[in-house]
Amino acid sequence: MNRLPSSASALACSAHALNLIEKRTLDHEEMKALNREVIEYFKEHVNPGFLEYRKSVTAGGDYGAVEWQAGSLNTLVDTQGQEFIDCLGGFGIFNVGHRNPVVVSAVQNQLAKQPLHSQELLDPLRAMLAKTLAALTPGKLKYSFFCNSGTESVEAALKLAKAYQSPRGKFTFIATSGAFHGKSLGALSATAKSTFRKPFMPLLPGFRHVPFGNIEAMRTALNECKKTGDDVAAVILEPIQGEGGVILPPPGYLTAVRKLCDEFGALMILDEVQTGMGRTGKMFACEHENVQPDILCLAKALGGGVMPIGATIATEEVFSVLFDNPFLHTTTFGGNPLACAAALATINVLLEQNLPAQAEQKGDMLLDGFRQLAREYPDLVQEARGKGMLMAIEFVDNEIGYNFASEMFRQRVLVAGTLNNAKTIRIEPPLTLTIEQCELVIKAARKALAAMRVSVEEA
């Protein structure tokens, strides 16, 4: 039987939500009621599948804690008042911390003037952010298209490459095994996880995947495509595969790919949605090898953990295919004033506080600690790896990784797995994490592993 719409119910629910937004604290009964409501509404109106994925990190094995507010730059507080060191970072969006005051202030000030643009008049913050990114990014990257997410930035990059290369008879894209570029149709065609791809087959034609980090496989693919007339329009890859399990390529790999792209006339698209904005110890991970892409994709941390924003930055030669008709690829909310204000403030904080260098320093400290734990617990930990504040601990099997996340939750540290590698727990904290908090995270990991070893021995 069809359910009839109810304005009264919608009004009551929205009013209840607005009341919660205004609250700063909850009493015990309000907390319990909110937890029940959130679980019920996820089950009935969001997606019940999410509940199972959020289950069992708590001591009682029930559904995950309900998030309430940021505690400090580097912590979260749940509805029960428990504070957690955030080593997940919203999958890499909180590079400048939670509710960074500079970013929040910029957004609040812009909100007081105008939240969204008219679409007809020229919006100044979009122009200023594009100029800022042209100055910040490497090489000849000059023009920016703004959107709302990482997958949108990849979609724009693929369409831009198509528009540029189609007149040249080049239509093929090469991506890499283990890659994650998003889940919209074009980005999913470049993503290499069968779980995400199979339900939506057939995807876009013309995509091939080669092993990540294997430069000879890349050369072979480019050669074969040329021989068969399937000339390559672009190679798309992540400098470090984030969702693939924080997989680092061999030194010199990006440089070699750049040379191959030049040799075969293919564009180089670098997806720095997760590695960009200081995460790996440089503003952009490609700077570790001084590699200059033709198209660069950004998102996640670009909005400072306050507003969603993505960007696709390209050279003038490539981007000029949109000059005659700038409406070939647009989005209503892309480059809106609130998002641009957040991005400009985020860049300012990253540069003023030299957070990329801090990411390198504190990342080295954390990674040294995790590698020591790997030596102490070889029966549980296979490897610790990473660069800057993008790290991973890989366990000997999937279940151990899951148990580690649960034990870390008990130690009040939030971590999570990666989408393409279930054995791997990602460590991706804010770049603002303090030295003391780094020490606490290592201490918590040691306690978690010790508890897990006891459980294994008792079993």
Swiss-Prot record:
InterPro entries: Aminotrans_3, Aminotrans_3_PPA_site, Class-III_PLP-dep_AT, Putrescine_aminotransferase, PyrdxlP-dep_Trfase, PyrdxlP-dep_Trfase_major, PyrdxlP-dep_Trfase_small. Induction: Up-regulated under nitrogen starvation conditions. Expression is sigma-54-dependent. Up-regulated by putrescine; this gene expression regulation is controlled by at least two sigma factors: rpoS under excess nitrogen conditions and rpoN under nitrogen-starvation conditions. Disruption phenotype: Cells lacking this gene show a high decrease in putrescine aminotransferase activity, but are still able to grow with putrescine as the sole nitrogen source. However, a mutant lacking both patA and either puuA, puuB or puuC cannot grow with putrescine as the sole nitrogen source. It comes from the Bacteria. Catalyzes the aminotransferase reaction from putrescine to 2-oxoglutarate, leading to glutamate and 4-aminobutanal, which spontaneously cyclizes to form 1-pyrroline. This is the first step in one of two pathways for putrescine degradation, where putrescine is converted into 4-aminobutanoate (gamma-aminobutyrate or GABA) via 4-aminobutanal, which allows E.coli to grow on putrescine as the sole nitrogen source. Also functions as a cadaverine transaminase in a a L-lysine degradation pathway to succinate that proceeds via cadaverine, glutarate and L-2-hydroxyglutarate. Its cofactor is pyridoxal 5'-phosphate. Can be used in the industrial production of the value-added compound 5-aminovalerate. Pfam families: Aminotran_3. Its EC number is 2.6.1.82, 2.6.1.29. Pyridoxal 5'-phosphate binds at G150, T151, Q274, T332. One of its GO terms (cellular component) is cytosol. GO terms for biological process: L-lysine catabolic process; putrescine catabolic process. The lineage of its organism: Bacteria, Pseudomonadati, Pseudomonadota, Gammaproteobacteria, Enterobacterales. It catalyses: an alkane-alpha,omega-diamine + 2-oxoglutarate = an omega-aminoaldehyde + L-glutamate; putrescine + 2-oxoglutarate = 1-pyrroline + L-glutamate + H2O; cadaverine + 2-oxoglutarate = 5-aminopentanal + L-glutamate. Homodimer. Pathway: Amine and polyamine degradation; putrescine degradation; 4-aminobutanal from putrescine (transaminase route): step 1/1; Amino-acid degradation. CDD domains: OAT_like. This is Putrescine aminotransferase. Optimum temperature is 60 degrees Celsius. Highly active from 20 to 80 degrees Celsius. It comes from Escherichia coli (strain K12). GO terms for molecular function: diamine transaminase activity; identical protein binding; protein homodimerization activity; putrescine--2-oxoglutarate transaminase activity; pyridoxal phosphate binding. Keywords: Aminotransferase, Pyridoxal phosphate, Transferase.
